[in-house]
Amino acid sequence: MGRIVVLYVDGAFGIGKTTVLRQIQKSAAYRFRRIYLEEPMRAWRSWFVDDHDAIREIYTTQELKDAGEIDLREASRRVCYAQVSLSAPFHIMNAVIYGIISGESEATSAHLGEGDYFVGVDRHPLASCLCFPVARFVTGYLEYTDLIALVATLPDYPRGASIAILDLSVEEQARRITERSRSGEHVNKTFLRILRNVFIIMYNTVAYLRNVSIDKACADREALEDFRGSQLESDMHKIDIQPRDDPNASETLFAVMASDATWRKNRKQSALFVYTMAKLDALLRSLNMHIVDINGLSQEQCAEKVVAISSKVPAVTARGNAPDLLFDAVEAYNADMGV
């Protein structure tokens, strides 16, 4: 009986995620049946109405904020709205995918071959409702309240998702973004570095949670100091943070979201904040996350690295017509979202 592997491919924008997934799709080197879920570009640019462009909205907002034409409160309102719009297609398709395969039993995915199925997904929902908002908070375009609101509304994603984070130098990323000249995109190396660091910090957060108990993580979060003015804030702006297998709490996303504003006069943290962080803890703790360094690699080599990861992550047994339903759903979505 065949197996189904769903692997999310993520990371900063302009680094080649879509190119890698296309390479896997078209390569004759693999015997398993494969498909990839494309970025929902139509939804981002003109979902139902032609003048709804969430990507342009964010970049325009950042430019207005930088020019002093709008304040942080207005910029944050606009960015938060745009991030919700960007997240919606991911939430929908995540529910579709797991609605089809959630009842299937787990299986080993080693050595995918003929009769097996690979579904590559261009971004996990966490990218648009966690990673990008965190990066925009760090760079001063999103208020703390709106960041926590976005994190608090994370849906209950199925546990155990597998994510391959592609990592590329900021210099090469900037070159690729300039080369592709996508409408509305701008090259801001400070933002690119911070966004790249957010994805690495997310990986480090998963590694940290793998090493500590729930109670220890909760105690560590209480001991964290305000992010603003911290060493982590400085590092996120100035250096390329590296993946670690044994990070401490001060090197995680929890440290980025640590704020004096969460403490009450009775010296207790806001219960709502504590519960929000516990929800994020539970979600991240369940993930299978891998870093793929793609610096200096060809498209074929990048594809090989991603496929190699697919043989190390959980799979589900392909029963009945589940594979056909899954592939039909992805094809319908891709046809609708293409621009």
From Swiss-Prot:
Gene3D superfamilies: P-loop containing nucleotide triphosphate hydrolases. The active site is at E39 (proton acceptor). GO terms for molecular function: ATP binding; thymidine kinase activity. Substrate binds at Y59, Q83, R182. GO terms for biological process: DNA biosynthetic process; TMP biosynthetic process. Its EC number is 2.7.1.21. ATP binds at G11, A12, F13, G14, I15, G16, K17, T18, R176. Keywords: ATP-binding, DNA synthesis, Early protein, Kinase, Nucleotide-binding, Transferase. It catalyses: thymidine + ATP = dTMP + ADP + H(+). Catalyzes the transfer of the gamma-phospho group of ATP to thymidine to generate dTMP in the salvage pathway of pyrimidine synthesis. The dTMP serves as a substrate for DNA polymerase during viral DNA replication. Allows the virus to be reactivated and to grow in non-proliferative cells lacking a high concentration of phosphorylated nucleic acid precursors. Belongs to the herpesviridae thymidine kinase family. Homodimer. This is Thymidine kinase. It comes from Psittacid herpesvirus 1 (isolate Amazon parrot/-/97-0001/1997). The gene is TK.
